[in-house]
């Protein structure tokens, strides 16, 4: 008896399908938020696929499609509700934007940083090496004469840190950044630079 009264009260206290509040407020909000979530997941999934993170991408793909099926079912059930269309389209646009922001914040994978300097290439390479980056330097020839080309493969989340080091040496240096789709991560994991490695070796010798 108590349970029946409870359900009766809930029926009048919570908006149900057919109620204007449910049809024009709650349902569109649900569609919008679900669409934002599934499109954000989809954006990250595509980026993970390009970086060969297959397991994570497959798991995200499952969640993405599951949410999409739930949302599209509600849209089809309410074809006469224009607010559902607006929520669906708005959620798609917002989800794409949020997905790109999340991907930038997560900064998954590695990048190739290429620096071309006519005068300060050796100094830039030394500073990056001292900071713990693996650096390769080679001679090149530009339209205005000889240049030094500095390469380093690093985690994407450390690009800003590396660029501060580079621009402290040469603020207007020319550089380019490319995605490194596949790397030998054991080679490019964080490691001490030349200066720090020398200090570490001395400490170990003292302890011995």
Swiss-Prot record:
InterPro entries tied to this protein: DUF2179, DUF5698, N-reg_PII/ATP_PRibTrfase_C, UPF0316
Listed GO CC annotations: plasma membrane
Presence of keyword DNA-binding: no
Transmembrane segments: 56-76, 82-102
Domain of life: Bacteria
Topology of the protein relative to the lipid bilayer: Multi-pass membrane protein
Compartments where located: Cell membrane
Keyword vocabulary terms for this entry: Cell membrane, Membrane, Transmembrane, Transmembrane helix
Keyword Iron-sulfur tagged: no
UniProt record similarity statement: Belongs to the UPF0316 family.
Full protein name: UPF0316 protein LIC_12973
Organism: Leptospira interrogans serogroup Icterohaemorrhagiae serovar copenhageni (strain Fiocruz L1-130)
